[in-house]
Amino acid sequence: MVATHEYEVVIVGAGPAGMCAGLYTGRSMLRSVVLERGFPGGELLNTEVIEDYIGFEHVLGHELATKFQAHAEKFGAEIRTSTPVESVTRRADGQFDCVTESGEVFVAPTVIVTAGGTPVKLDVPGEIEYAGKGVSYCAICDGAFYKGHTILVIGGGDAACEEADFLTRYAEKVYLVHRRDTFRASKLVQQRAFANPKIEVITDTVVDEIVGAEGLMTHARIRNLKTGAASDLIATGIFIFVGFKPNTGIIRDHVEHDAAGYLITDSMMQTSVPGLFAAGDVRAQLTRQVTTAVGDATTAAIGVEKYLTARKNGQPAPAAPPMLGASA
């Protein structure tokens, strides 16, 4: 028999946005559950140190995740791990069915999608073949395996520069490879990476193939985009940080989204579907930081409380205030 659980709000994903949303809905005395496919923390678990979260000059990613979880649970949010959500559908009566891979159904009149994203792949030959055998998307998870090795880091944003710097703790040499001649990482992050004597920066260059032997990566075939010159770069590992795509597949076909799959919301974080809210890295916005994720989540949780109050009183849902800069 299928297990059915009823709540006032279901939150999909236990990253910073999901746990913050759970904190606020819990404080509003709403029956709240946070469903997480893995472990609480989201991208915090893949980040060694956080230095730009107000109040914490220097905090380990997993420590901040633990603090978030404890805070949310203190105010009544139930966090269920190893509970991947397979689909979210809205009934005619306005209730949502959130179905997990195991077949459990979580029913609620409101849902906040905070499912984050997954790393974007290079889509080059050898990437899948050598995944876990030289190809990685997580420096903290796999960096220690490359002590004394030569490795590549691919990307031009904060993640690529920060992780290249981190990986020099283990690797003897790190090639930081970027397809453009300028980096989009913040200036401070760039300066730190570029000043590291173990890092060699290679610009205007792409990886065409990841090559290996006997089941392990041995080198990468790279190509300069300006000259067309190709060469082999000897390395036993490649860490790929070229962005990520939103985990919105469970709902994307039923809600307004942009070309990349990010969910479009109003100023209260409500999507085009009444009662369905979004926060954090699944939402279409310019910045993707821990601070913006928890800001989104705070607004979404307040929006949920207002939506439920109106629903209980038989009133229409309150209209969201216009977005900043929107025409009247």
Walk through the language-model features, giving the residues of each:
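A conserved FAD-binding loop/helix module that cradles the flavin
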Residues: 161-165, 273, 279-328
